[in-house]
Amino acid sequence: MRRLKIGIRPQLIIIVCFASLFSLLILGIVTGIYFSANLKNLRLERLLVISQLKRTQVQQAIQYIAYQVMTVSEVDSLTVPLSNYRAGNNSKAVFSEAQNYLQQYVLTTDSFTAARLYDLDLQVVASSFDNMTLISESAQDVVYPLQPNRSMPPVLGTPSGLYFTGPIANNSDNFNSRYFMGITVPVLSNSSIILSQPSISGYLTIVAAAESIRSALNSTSEDDYQAMAVQPVYGDPQKGIDNLSQNAYNGDNEVIGFKLVFPVENSLLEAGTIYNINSSSSMKTALASNSGTATGVKSFFGKKVAIGFSRISVQDNLNWSIVIVQSNSVFNGPANKLRKITIGVVIGIGAFMCFVTFPLAVWFIRPITKLKEATEAITKYKKEKLNSVNSNSPTSGSGSGSGSGSGSRANSDSSADQSLSLDTGKRNSINSSSFSSSYSTGIRLPARIPRSKKIFKDELTELSEAFNIMTEELDKQYTHLEDRVKLRTKELEASKIQAEAANEAKTVFIANISHELRTPLNGILGMTSIAMEEEDPNVIHDSLKLIHRSGELLLHILTELLTYSKNTLNRSKLEKSNFQILEIVYQVRSIFNKLAHDQRVNFKILVKPNIFRKLIIYGDSNRIIQIVMNLVSNSLKFTPVDGSVSVSFKLLGEYDHERSKKLDYKKVCILNDSSSSTVAVPPPTPPSDTKPNPKPKSTPTPKPDPTRSHLVDHNNRSANTTSPLTPVRKPTNQTKNKSITNNVTKQNMKIRKKKKTNKNLHNNNNNNKNDNSDFLMNRRLSGSHKFNNTNDEELSPTAIEKNIDKYLTSSADSDNISVTTLSTVQYETTIFESQFKSKPLPALPVDAKPQVSGKIDENDVNDEDPSGGSIKDDDSEDTINEKQGISSSPSSSSSSNEKQENSPRSNDSTTVTVTRPRHNMMPSAQDFKSYPTFDKKPEYDSNMSNNEIVKNNRVYRIRNMYQPKVWVIQIEVTDTGPGIEPALQEKVFEPFVQGDQTLSRSYGGTGLGLSICRQLATMMHGTLTLKSTIGKGSTFTLTLPLPQTGEIMVPPEDMAEFCEDEFNPAAKINRKVAFEDGDIDTESQQQENPSSEEDTQGDRNVQSSTSSSPPNSSSTDSALPASDSSDIGGTNKSKTTSHGNNKNINAKKRIITNSSASSTKGTKRHTNNDGGGGVNGNHSDDNKDLTLTIDKPSLFTRGSTGTANSGTTSSHSDKKILYPTPTTTTTTTTTTDHTTVLDDISHLRVLVAEDNSVNQEVISRMLKQEGITNLTMACNGAKAIDFVKESIENNENFDLIFMDVQMPEVDGLKATKMIRKNLQYNKPIIALTAFADESNVKECLNSGMSGFITKPISKTNIKKVLVEFLSNEVVTS
């Protein structure tokens, strides 16, 4: 089919005309829309600027009036009469000067028309008004807010309060009536020269004319816009307007209406009339935000308007919005005019283009015609040339290489030439059939142009394929771009959903945290007001307790918020040190045993495998304790009565750092574990285990032979499969293996023999398990102090420590902490107590022998060190007080000053009690304040500098790891609570999210605890996960990689005893049996000597469930009936009795009978008063008198009843256990001093440098309660330096200085440096700081301070500081 030919000239004319018109149309539309939008935006910005200018004018006018009023309120003519009146001068003449001043002020100013001066009873004591301007009665009721029958606005209760009333028209019926507004401010005066801060003595109300404010709102052109001052009206949509909150924002109400402050000309809205907020979308928009613009909104009368608004922010009750209103017709007038101009221009240009296109087309087509003719000529010549070449080429393919090549090229050219044919009969035509496709380019399309079906063709047809290729490429790019846009859209939608969820969570959090913050504040304010009106000291004391607990709760909430923010900003740092896992275990148990007992929750702690106890690991133990405390406290909070909470500490295996790093530490991987799970096979069972630990199904491990487990030699590494360590050096001799099977068999026979005997005896004890005397006794004692074993007659350092302990456990210490603030207080207490101890773990000397013997022979004991019983062995200097009666007196070695202690252990092992300096003691449960408990000595005594540790009176050496290994530990906290929904199990780790997000939730909290725990776990490259089942409970799993830096060298024969504690499920202490002392021989006593924290260092027998124990003991099963070998009634009575005599105990070693062994039925234990104990003291039989040294605070829990001091016979008839008195002491002493070391410290001089008067009062009263009366107060660092300098010059040095860190003039750090360097002051300086952070603590200590106390200041911390730093001063004095 032949195509109809149309020349390029007509096509060009049509295309140019169409293109010009179409382009102009597009340009006109785009330009019109763009410039119209810009013009509207400029108009809106104009309205906004006008509203901001009006707002500024009004605000400046109001502030100017307020400034004048505040200036008047500070005039002496007003403040002095009020101060005199408040001081008691009630004469009428006292306010005459104020009356004259107000009258003169009102008459001489045009802005003010009236004034009133009120006293604190809101009675008018002076008033003045302008006779020329009379204020109507209705207006006076509004502008004068203070009346006796009205409540005073809360804002006036603050010294800087400012309260506005009005404006109100003097005559509401007259449009031009004057407007007045009242400004009320408190009048401050200082009625006493003692007080530095002025107080509120009265109030001043001045009525000012509001004409200056009204004039600022007048518009220059009424036809252009209207300026309105709009005041929102708050209230409940259901109940209506709240008249009390019309002038102030109330968070519980919302804007339900509005009213005009001043009338507006040419407006039907009346000033002072309240209109519904929904009746005008323009006002609703204006009152919804502080400033902005809006178009297309409707006015009160339904007309579309454009507005610009800005809100005034002067005071809470003055929240006007300045609204500039412009009608839609006026606002869109310039844009409509621009649109008409654009349309006219487009039509004119289109007509002009059509007129000039025809002659231009004729002229422009000539080059194209010439080019076509030249192309046709070239094509014709090429075709003829190719035909001649084809005719001359050979027909055969054979011939020379040249001929073959020519023939090939000729055939190729011929075949190519056949694709072109020249139509010589027609003009301006080219046959393009050789192309596979030919598309029309009549219009430009973004897609591939199909082959044209037109009946004509032109020169542009050949360009269609190239265009289509380009179009295909563009199509690919557009498609790829569209996919990317869709992907970005999905990401934006996901981000939007996530942001909405976060906003919703924050909204719920704000509601919840408001309740959490107001709850303690309500307790503080309410109980304060109650205590101020009470006269009963007991009621006041109870009120103060509640105030203290509420303050701790508030501190806990704020600390969690600050901790989360600090972790989010990556400002938290890990404070790593060497520690043993039992340190964490004992602290957790000490903290939560009492809480679980009170809640009747079975609380258990397990450590497995037993070899875990031998590891010295390196990490931030405080952060680990913080995580575990948070998890355990959450479990106890949600676990019901008779439920259970268990904490298990597991050693999983060696850490695979490479795999964990590849996973970005999202999981903690273990070596030789093919799966990505963090669960791995635990190490083989250590010697003391009776059954293998459970292993995961995925990685089976052969069960170790229990008969060979306790025959493993530590020095024989080829046979040792339980130790995770590699040898440091080859030992010189082998340790002989020894089995304890025979001993265990004998012991089991005795267990069965005595089980029946004790059955009835334990049942009788059940009736006394809830005696309140033990609980009251526990609440009056503090369990956070250290003890040392010594028999010193003089005030040696160890004797001082004993008296210090007595001082700390006095009944005056009532600083009981709150359950709710447990974790916060514990962590801050850990930081506080870190100044009293350090735990270095130096490298083991090259020539040192890895001695692991726990037996010290008498021949190894040499001369004592004067520091309080220090003796030397072959390798190191140890402070050892042998149980057989090794003398510890620094001044005499005679036997008269020695004490014999009877040990129930066998003769083949010497039991020793090792006393260490306080700074070398390994922290244990008593080092952290939890619930007040009995004072006991730490379970562990370590001397890290000598690389040794003491447990159960046995000395074990610590070997350093020269190639430390990194182990994976797992801490699981499992409870039987209600569980967490699956949808929330991952969200609970997000900030501000809780398991119960409703406002009716049963438990409080900020929703940040678990988030902080996961942050801390992530900082340590660990994980924190949750598994929970609704109705069954939850399990939180903390998995951490921690490097091992050392190992406690325990011989295989001592491994069973070393692992004998309540945290070992296979330990003897957890067996449900009891013994009577009369039938237990020395051998069985040695085998049944557990190492739990509740056991004392003397006679320790395996106990059954005690009758006084709660269902939360970590060592027994709550399902079994409770029983005990001690009479709890007698124990409780003795605790109450002995507490009264606690202050009369001599400053000597405390001797106490173990309540779990010494108070058994039918057994008598007498203290040894013969005084004949020497170095070679005789061991007493089990039926003879036994003495026992109290270890540490005994928690009143199952597995260990409360321990009571006993200096008399434990009788079965009266069932009383008494503390030793001076007449029944177990030591032969010649001293008659019955006072403690710190009983008389009134002579000591103390300087307190504190700038805050309240803090000065607090610390001064606390120090006076402790007996220090010679106090000197300094308000800044410069004063403190002057006082110290003056005391040194007068030879009356201060014994102790409390230095605040932040003070004016000279801060505490700089002052300390100057005192230390310039004045050579060498006495203790204690920092008082509110920033309880490790970095701040280090800065304080580096500046020369001796210690620190964090604010809020605690009496317990004050006591500890006095004990630590004033003991030497007391002894010297």
UniProtKB/Swiss-Prot annotation:
Which ranges are annotated Low complexity under compositional bias?
A: 387-397, 407-440, 760-770, 887-896, 1104-1118, 1197-1211, 1221-1230
Inactivation phenotype: Impairs the hyphal formation and attenuates the virulence in a mouse systemic candidiasis model.
- Which SUPFAM superfamilies does the record cross-reference, listed alphabetically? ATPase domain of HSP90 chaperone/DNA topoisomerase II/histidine kinase, CheY-like, Homodimeric domain of signal transducing histidine kinase
Keywords (A to Z) from UniProt:
ATP-binding, Cell membrane, Cell wall biogenesis/degradation, Coiled coil, Glycoprotein, Kinase, Magnesium, Membrane, Metal-binding, Nucleotide-binding, Phosphoprotein, Stress response, Transferase, Transmembrane, Transmembrane helix, Two-component regulatory system, Virulence
Q: Where is this region: Disordered?
A: 387-440, 675-777, 841-933, 1080-1230
- Histidine kinase domain location is 512-1044
**This protein's name:** Histidine protein kinase SLN1
Q: Lineage in the entry?
A: Eukaryota, Fungi, Dikarya, Ascomycota, Saccharomycotina
